[in-house]
Swiss-Prot record:
InterPro entries in alphabetical order: Cyt_trans-like, PPAT, Rossmann-like_a/b/a_fold
Role: Reversibly transfers an adenylyl group from ATP to 4'-phosphopantetheine, yielding dephospho-CoA (dPCoA) and pyrophosphate.
Name the record gives this protein: Phosphopantetheine adenylyltransferase
Annotated binding of ATP, by residue: 9-10, 17, 88-90, 98, 123-129
Pfam families hit by this protein: CTP_transf_like
GO MF annotations, alphabetized: ATP binding; pantetheine-phosphate adenylyltransferase activity
Species this chain originates from: Chloroflexus aggregans (strain MD-66 / DSM 9485)
Site positions for Transition state stabilizer: 17
CDD domains noted in UniProt: PPAT
Assembly with partners or alone: Homohexamer.
Amino acid sequence: MRIAIYPGSFDPVTYAHLDIARRATRIFDRVIMAVFDRPQKRLLFSTEERLHLLRTATADLDHVEAMSYNTLTVEFARQVGACAIVRGLRAGSDFEAEFQMAQVNQTIDPGIEVVVLMAGRPFAHISSTAVREMASLGRDPVEFTPPVVVAALREKFAQRG
């Protein structure tokens, strides 16, 4: 069985993320959307909330599951028996950071490939940052993220008042 991980903060998950995961299942038998549990950035949603949103959003995607991890990404890939790390690129500006990370991962474990999928045309402009920004300004980002996420964003920003 060919397993890949698709790591990210998924804060929150967007249709762009789901598109990459869906397309990765054409290449791999199982895709694990791996939620990083200790990211360096401030997050809107907790790890548990992000996992819940991801699991709900991927419920209809065969061969996709969500898990959290708090180790180096390449070490998590090894732990779950993955042969590849999937990354999505939206624009050329994403390339440099992804290239550097791929080089680090290849140095740590040359047996784990990095597979980059270009964002599909309708999704290339979608980012979690833009989704959070829209929601913080009172606009429901229904075009960019699943309904469960829209509802969670509404609730989160209502709590912040």
